[in-house]
Design a protein with these regions (language model features):
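Active-site-proximal beta-strand elements of phosphoester/diester hydrolases
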Residues: 1-9, 98-110, 142
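Active-site beta-strand termini and strand-to-loop segments that position acidic
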Residues: 70, 94-97, 220-221, 246-250
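Active-site beta-strand/loop signature of hydrolases that rely on acidic residues for catalysis
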Residues: 7, 23-41, 101, 130-151, ...
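Conserved beta strand-loop-helix elements of the APE1-like EEP
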Residues: 60-75, 193, 205-225
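Surface-exposed cleft-lining segments at the edges of enzyme active sites
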Residues: 81-82, 107-123, 158-162
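N-terminal, active-site-proximal structural segment of metallo-dependent hydrolase catalytic domains
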Residues: 1-47, 51, 57, 62-63, ...
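Metal-dependent phosphoesterases centered on the DNase I-like endonuclease/exonuclease/phosphatase
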Residues: 51, 125-210, 214
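Structured beta-strand-rich core segments of catalytic domains in phosphoester-bond hydrolases
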Residues: 37, 42-109
Length: 250
């Protein structure tokens, strides 16, 4: 099964930049989107053979997630069941016979780390949410997790040390999650590869490949042997992020 995840940084804008042909070319079983930045009814985007599920932020033009799937789920849930976190459209979970698929758009800690304290609360609650799912069946979790985990995952680690997305606190929370039974699929297959998934729109960052790897597929450790491929599609444009992929023998 082929899974794709892409922070589209505004789906309506991305549709104007060839999204539909990219979607069809990637030909995924599951296509997860983050930062859709839209409300219900603003875009009617259907693909033959796919059902879609949407979680919208209450605030207009902000956050939001979606999943297109070729496989009818047993159940669908939105958010993580924590009132504090469930107003921004950040999480969707699809349940299948032998796994859960979770897509997530993790809150950014923002300039001057204004939202870092909230981010720490989110991290603990999201980790508990995933562990509770994992106790029932295996989990595939994807999305913009808004952290470059190790120095290999960011072009300029020294100058970004206290910037949102590369603080010790955020990196430690990712380590905690992985230590609690999850595997970073790309790093598992490609331990030394330097590839990024996000580039600032400023300073010609993408042209210079001054990027960050902040988009992930994580799987329950017991799915490790079923990871057949993990890719980052750096050639696909349309957003400041590019799509990431995992193929699993499920």
């Amino acid at each position: 099964m082929k899974f794709i995840s892409w922070n589209v940084n505004g789906l309506r804008a991305c549709v104007g930049k060839d999204f539909e042909s990219q979607f069809k070319a990637l030909d995924a079983d599951f296509f997860c989107l983050q930062e859709t930045k839209m409300q219900e009814g603003q875009l009617d985007l259907k693909f033959e053979g796919y059902e879609s599920y949407w979680n919208y932020a209450e605030k207009k033009g902000y956050s939001g997630t979606a999943i297109y799937t070729r496989h009818q789920p047993l159940s669908v849930s939105y958010g993580m069941g924590v009132e504090e976190h469930d107003h921004e459209g950040r999480v969707i979970t699809l349940e299948y016979d032998n796994f859960y698929l979770v897509t997530c758009y993790t809150p950014n800690s923002q300039t001057e780390l204004k939202r870092l304290d909230y981010r720490m609360t989110w991290e603990d609650d999201f980790r508990k949410f995933l562990k509770d799912l994992d106790a029932k069946k295996a989990v595939v979790v994807c999305g913009d997790l808004n952290v470059a985990h190790q120095e290999i995952d960011i072009k300029n680690p020294k100058t970004n040390r206290r910037n949102a997305g590369f603080t010790d606190e955020e990196r430690d929370k990712m380590t905690e999650l992985l230590n609690d039974g999850f595997t970073d699929t790309f790093r598992y297959l490609h331990p030394e590869e330097v590839t990024y998934s996000w580039w600032s729109y400023r300073f010609k960052a993408r042209e210079k490949n001054a990027g960050w790897r902040i988009d992930y597929f994580l799987v329950s450790d017991r799915l490790r042997e079923q990871i057949t491929e993990a890719k980052i599609h750096t050639d696909i444009m349309g957003s400041d992020h590019c799509p990431v992929e995992v193929d699993l023998a499920l």
